[in-house]
């Protein structure tokens, strides 16, 4: 089995190996993008709001793949508003406001004891 087929099976899309983009859902397209990146055997993967344009039903599919990558030891830098995911999977969490890092901490400290007033306000609205 070639690497493409192994990776497609890993993200639950083996049957889509020959599909065109127009035949894929948003969540499937995101998982295919992850597969394409994994084919290059990266040391680090960067994600910029990977779920922001997805229907709510598709978000879980993409987060599941990313969760698996994290559990396998893949280093990931993820820009996200998915706070539950950041808390569960992150080893460091940063809050960026107006283009500046306002707070950086472990997930436990970040979510349970935020020091920055703007972060406290943000978390009170999204959690």
Task: For the regions a language model picked out, list residue spans one by one.
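Catalytic Walker B motif of ABC-type/P-loop ATPase nucleotide-binding domains
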Residues: 45-48
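Conserved signature/switch motifs of ABC ATPase nucleotide-binding domains
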Residues: 19-22, 40, 72
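Hydrophobic anchor residue at the start of the ABC signature
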Residues: 34
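Helical segment within the ABC ATPase nucleotide-binding domain
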Residues: 59-72
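A short, surface-exposed alpha-helical micro-motif characterized by mixed small hydrophobic
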Residues: 86-88
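H-loop/switch region of ABC-family ATPase nucleotide-binding domains
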Residues: 80-81
